[in-house]
């Protein structure tokens, strides 16, 4: 299970907590880079495995599922160009939890043609319809409308209701400059 290689805190972390709490599987690992600030936090939940280590690659090759909130190549195809030689021997399913709700058409990057996703989680009906009926090329059985794992962790507030306005901006590529590598 993973979020990004350097941090937890997204849907992968909440799915990992859910699996450990409800199934207590000893063979479930959360993947993070060696010097991530989240290692201590995640280690309290379960086993942490470090990205791009021999142990990581061996566990990946022998895994039944790879579950992540991100579908970048370092997670989805960690062997890079060597994947074509290794992938025929790997019988695992990739579960894409997503990071957020898809607003724009991402099918030129996120389609069955480019990503071998076995289960694609959607969290809104409009998003589900867009993916199922759009150019993503996934079989309808691959797409599930379940909501995001981190939303399941929201606490029920049983105190007196308050009138609160929450301003929650989201990231948009059109609002930022170029990507800074680092």
Task: Please describe what each predicted stretch is.
Residues 1-3, 69-71, 98, 148, ...:
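Short loop/turn segments at strand-loop or loop-helix junctions that form parts
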Residues 1-67, 74:
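N-terminal pre-catalytic "stem/leader" segment of glycosyltransferase-like enzymes
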Residues 6-7, 74-75, 102-104, 172-175:
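Short, acidic Gly/Pro/Ser/Thr-rich loop/turn segments
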Residues 8-23, 149-182:
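Conserved catalytic-core segment of nucleotide-activated headgroup transferases in glycan assembly
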Residues 9-13, 39-43, 77-80, 106-108, ...:
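A short acidic (Asp/Glu
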Residues 22-24, 42-44, 88-90, 137-139, ...:
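Short, structurally constrained coil/turn elements
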Residues 26, 63, 92, 162-163:
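Short coil/turn segments at beta-strand junctions that form active-site/ligand-binding loops
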Residues 47-51, 61, 65-76, 82-153:
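Active-site-proximal region of nucleotide-activated glycan assembly enzymes
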């Amino acid at each position: 299970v993973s979020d990004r290689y350097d941090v937890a805190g997204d849907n992968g972390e909440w799915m990992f907590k859910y699996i450990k709490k409800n199934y207590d599987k000893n063979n479930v690992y959360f993947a993070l880079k060696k010097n991530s600030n989240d290692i201590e936090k995640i280690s309290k939940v379960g086993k942490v495995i470090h990205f791009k280590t021999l142990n990581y690659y061996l566990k990946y090759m022998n895994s039944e599922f790879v579950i992540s909130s991100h579908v970048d190549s370092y997670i989805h195809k960690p062997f890079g160009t060597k994947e074509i030689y290794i992938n025929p021997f790997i019988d695992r399913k990739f579960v894409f939890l997503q990071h957020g709700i898809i607003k724009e058409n991402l099918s030129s990057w996120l389609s069955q043609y480019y990503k071998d996703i076995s289960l694609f989680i959607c969290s809104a009906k409009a998003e589900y319809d867009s993916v199922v009926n759009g150019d993503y090329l996934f079989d309808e059985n691959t797409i599930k409308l379940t909501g995001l794992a981190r939303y399941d962790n929201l606490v029920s507030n049983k105190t007196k209701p308050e009138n609160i306005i929450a301003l929650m901006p989201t990231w948009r590529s059109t609002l930022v400059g170029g990507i800074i590598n680092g």
